[in-house]
Amino acid sequence: MKADIHPAYEAIEATCSCGNVIKTRSTLCKPIHLDVCSECHPFYTGKQKVLDTGGRIDRFKQRFGVFGATK
């Protein structure tokens, strides 16, 4: 690597809106504010919503199920 051409790679803190602070390294060299992190994201916390699309799937199978049927 060439000397003095790469940006500074320093330790920074990323602060989430939930208050969680993550220490990481970046070339940005200033604190980052996050909207969501692994502590508050619904996928990681297990509080995700399941959308009920069963009616749409059944309707699709009724209309187009004939085309996918094997002979």
UniProtKB/Swiss-Prot annotation:
GO terms for cellular component: ribonucleoprotein complex; ribosome. Transmembrane segments: none annotated. Its cofactor is Zn(2+). Zn(2+) binds at residues 16, 18, 37, 40. InterPro entries: Ribosomal_bL28/bL31-like_sf, Ribosomal_bL31, Ribosomal_bL31_A, Ribosomal_bL31_sf. SUPFAM superfamilies: L28p-like. GO terms for molecular function: metal ion binding; rRNA binding; structural constituent of ribosome. Keywords: Metal-binding, Ribonucleoprotein, Ribosomal protein, RNA-binding, rRNA-binding, Zinc. It comes from the Bacteria. The keyword Ribonucleoprotein applies. Binds 1 zinc ion per subunit. GO terms for biological process: translation. Gene3D superfamilies: Ribosomal protein L31 (4.10.830.30). Binds the 23S rRNA. PANTHER family: 50S RIBOSOMAL PROTEIN L31, CHLOROPLASTIC (PTHR33280), LARGE RIBOSOMAL SUBUNIT PROTEIN BL31A (PTHR33280:SF6). Belongs to the bacterial ribosomal protein bL31 family. Type A subfamily. Part of the 50S ribosomal subunit. NCBIfam families: L31, PRK00019.1, PRK00528.1. HAMAP family: Ribosomal_bL31_1. This is Large ribosomal subunit protein bL31. The lineage of its organism: Bacteria, Pseudomonadati, Pseudomonadota, Gammaproteobacteria, Pseudomonadales.
